[in-house]
Curated annotation (Swiss-Prot):
A motif (Nudix box) lies at residues 38-59. It comes from the Bacteria. The gene is rppH. HAMAP family: Nudix_RppH. PROSITE patterns: NUDIX, NUDIX_BOX. CDD domains: NUDIX_Ap4A_hydrolase_plant_like (cd03671). NCBIfam families: PRK00714.1-1 (NF001934), PRK00714.1-4 (NF001937), PRK00714.1-5 (NF001938). One of its GO terms (molecular function) is pyrophosphatase activity. This is RNA pyrophosphohydrolase. Keywords: Hydrolase. Accelerates the degradation of transcripts by removing pyrophosphate from the 5'-end of triphosphorylated RNA, leading to a more labile monophosphorylated state that can stimulate subsequent ribonuclease cleavage. Its cofactor is a divalent metal cation.
Length: 161
């Protein structure tokens, strides 16, 4: 499902533990780390996609988390030219993402990145909130910055309570 401008709808997930750290996952077979994310299927709401992706990529059911916040609108990133598949139709030039911040309610031992037969991650760790901005691939960095800036007041206000 690609929109008229060539962007694929997608959800991004920032999962927080009680200490305010965020879930940071290593892409399988690569030295590349990111937040969980995934496409929104036809006739699926962003929230439905969020919970499907959370189960597929992190192994957590909806009751294991609480949605703390969602971005007000779509955040977009464009793929580098070398990653665009010009032979596919329609051509996907990037992702438009609805981001969600989740609070982990379950024990972290329930996290399972090999829940499906085709896992996306082969490792994970908790990192400080702003750490991902210096580590994520450059073409996703501005979207991460915008989502994290929007969510920071919510997270840090919760920590003060």
């Amino acid at each position: 499902m690609i929109d008229a401008e060539g962007y694929r709808p997608n959800v991004g997930i920032i999962l927080c533990n009680p200490q305010g750290e965020v879930f940071w996952a290593r892409r399988i077979g690569q030295d590349s780390w990111q937040f969980p994310q995934g496409g929104i299927k036809k006739d699926e709401s962003p929230e439905e996609a969020l919970f499907r992706e959370l189960k597929e990529e992190v192994g957590l059911p909806p009751e294991a988390v609480e949605i703390v916040a969602g971005t007000r609108g779509w955040l977009r990133y464009r793929l580098p030219k070398k990653m665009i598949r010009y032979d596919s139709h329609p051509v996907c030039v990037g992702q438009k993402q609805k981001w969600f911040m989740l609070q982990l309610l379950a024990d972290e031992s329930e996290i399972c990145t090999n829940y499906t037969d085709k896992p996306e991650f082969d490792g994970w760790r908790w990192v400080s909130y702003w750490y991902p901005l210096g580590q994520v691939v450059s073409f996703k960095r501005e979207v991460y910055r915008r989502a994290m800036r929007e969510f920071a007041p919510v997270l840090f206000k919760r920590e003060e309570s």
